[in-house]
């Protein structure tokens, strides 16, 4: 049996916890909140530390030094991170769902995730190149399959 089916999120080791991340890059997208409605909007503008090809953080171990507002996803804060996409493994497991068939823990690589259109690969630009963030609002990060 797989560890994510046998353990609660709180029982996982740090290595197991980190391996839940599928590396989609959606949590690294800039998000906007409407002042009036408090509705959340994703943009296709990513954190400047995100590698646009690999969908991985270029400075993961020291990311908080470069981006203080970066949020570490932990078992303690997962309930409050309602901005995480429905496809996120942390969110899925917290909500009692299973890992999707495209998840790298099940497939052995990120390829199936990229092919399913779940990741940010080939869909984003760096926030450094953005002038008007409102022009970059997108709906595709909300996609969740399986």
UniProtKB/Swiss-Prot annotation:
- In terms of superkingdom, the source organism counts as Bacteria
Stretch forming the signal peptide: none
UniProt cross-references to InterPro entries, sorted A to Z: Puta_zinc/iron-chelating_dom, UCP006173
Q: Which family does it belong to?
A: Belongs to the UPF0260 family.
> Per its UniProt record, what PANTHER family does this chain match?
UPF0260 PROTEIN YCGN
Name the chain's protein: UPF0260 protein Sden_1632
User: What species was this sequence derived from?
Assistant: Shewanella denitrificans (strain OS217 / ATCC BAA-1090 / DSM 15013)
């Amino acid at each position: 049996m797989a560890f994510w089916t046998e353990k609660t999120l709180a029982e996982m080791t740090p290595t197991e916890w980190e391996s839940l991340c599928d590396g989609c890059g959606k949590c690294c997208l800039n998000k906007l909140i409407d002042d009036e409605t408090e509705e959340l909007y994703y943009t296709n503008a990513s954190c400047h530390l995100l590698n646009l090809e690999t969908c991985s953080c270029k400075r993961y171990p020291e990311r908080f030094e470069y981006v203080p507002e970066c949020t570490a996803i932990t078992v303690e804060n997962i309930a409050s991170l309602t901005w995480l996409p429905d496809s996120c493994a942390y969110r899925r497991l917290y909500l009692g769902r299973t890992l999707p068939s495209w998840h790298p823990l099940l497939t052995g690589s990120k390829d199936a995730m990229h092919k399913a259109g779940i990741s940010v690969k080939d869909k984003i630009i760096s926030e450094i190149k953005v002038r008007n963030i409102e022009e970059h609002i997108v709906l595709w990060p909300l996609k969740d399959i399986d």
